[in-house]
Amino acid sequence: MSFVSRFLSFALLVTVLISCGCQPPRDPMLDLLDVDLTKTKQDDLNRTMALVDSEIRFEQKEFSNNMATGLNRWAETRGSELDDQSWREDELTKELMEASGSLDIAEGFKDLSFFNTDGYYLQQSNWISQIANRVTDPEIQMAPFELYRMAADNYKPDEDVEAPLVEVVKKLHPEMGDDAGQTVANSMSVFDWVVRNIQLLPDSNLTDGEQEEARLNDSETAAAAGIPGVGYQRYPWQSLLYGQGDYVDRAKIFMLGLRELGIDSVMLATKGENGSLVPWAVGVVVGENYYLFDSKLGLPIPGEKLGSIATLDQVRANPELITSLSLTNEESLADNTDYWVKPEQLDDLVALVYTSPESVSKRMSNLEAALPKELRTDLAFSTSEIAARLPAKEGVAMEPWDVGYQTHEFRQAIRNALEKKSDDVISAKLNDYYFNEFYIDNFVVYRTARARFFKGKFGLDSEGRSLNAIQSFQRLKYTQEQIDNLGSDSDQQRRLGIRKEAEQNVTDFNTEVRSVQGQMNLIRRDAGLFLAQCHFDNGSMNAAANWLKNIKAEDGVDRWNDGITYLLGRSQEKLKDYDQAIEILSSDQLQQSHGNLIRARMLKEIVNGL
């Protein structure tokens, strides 16, 4: 029988079998191929996601390009498998998406392809997840909360107490059960980390004339025009990387950290004179209550019992909880010592649910579902579902918060302007970028050190192949000799990514060296505070205090004076040198002085009552 005859006979047999409802046996090789293909797809995804947590010293642009390329390759190989029919457009963010139509990332939220900025979003989620889970570890969770421990009748936990901070919270809130106590304790831990490690910047409240001077383009909205404003100038990952942010930047990181822990929260906003919304305090959902955390004050809003945290219902019922947040003349001689919110403003609030173009996109929903458990973070979330879980309160409306969209608009304006940096007028308007961001964006080992800190990598590598966070920042405390000798130090050049190309002339090489030397001067100024933060997080309060005292006297650290002073006060508080802590926190020359003085007041009252 010829090959053609045999093939036709086989085809006829298959047809008969199918018509009878029977199927021919599947070739086992096909099963093996399917398994191999599935494994290849997953390996491809794992390799790409490994870049998020990698210590390979990528340039930022190289990192974002590699992430987008890898994710899009994975998305293309998955094809129709990725088309999750259960995904639905988020109803509450439709208007935000339409209003942000000029953004590619908003326009493409229904697509499966990834954008170059998505790598930063994934890295941000990874960093915040590691921070939130690390600081809520019961074994270390209690360490920063000396003030609250003393307020809880000088509580001294027995060795067999598994979650001492939860016990402190329950003592300060006698009506609270274990689950609620755990939620509040975890919220305190994430909030406290953010306040300690993100130095508070002043609000960007520009006059009309200053706004026009700062304008980068003709867009109608301030954010899209590149005009600085409160809360939208930095992505959360940038605030983490730079170690600075305004009170809204702090709140965003706090809320995202809570989300990683499965805790709902909103930004409660008051109404301004022109009807605009003014962010006030983060309301953490615990049962039917909003527990209040003020990121500008740097404190949970105190309740009636010393050391307790107030709820929205409580401050509405007892206006004195708000008015008592104003400072006395003995505490401060500042021109305005009033707390920035009045009790009557609390009758008409808006609960803002934090969202972003990425979090409601189809691509992030599919990616999160495909990630293995050990790599999974909270990438996608429905604003509508969060809103449905919020406690209903009279006089509290609910809206999605547009700040995440405004950030994309602002950063797009900056990116477009940087392409026109040869224009002297535009270049002058970018001074803030060059002064505060450029040197960090281009200094790879700095970013690696920060990432090690976020992960809590404080232990020694037994094989000696990788530095921990403390060692990384110690290495960044460059001596003047190291900076001066960079041009002849080939080892240091290699570590900093300086390579003299064969075709590069001496003048260009020397120009590059001088640029890096300038960056080294700025980096060593920053590294001292970051090193002290590592020691504090690692429970070494003496080491933190010693470092802070030393660097306070260094030249050029004025940029970090707020962070140094606050962390030194907190270190002395933990070391039980309460008088010294009160004195340090009582300085009224800092951006966070108002909240520090309230903390000093609380600490003094607690110590006097022991």
Positions of the model-derived regions?
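Hydrophobic/aromatic-rich core segments of domains that either
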Residues: 168-181, 186-196, 203, 224-231, ...
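Short solvent-exposed coil/turn linkers within tandem alpha-helical repeat scaffolds
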Residues: 514-522, 552-561, 586-607
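"A position-specific structural signal for the A-helix of alpha-solenoid helical repeats
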Residues: 526, 530, 563, 567, ...
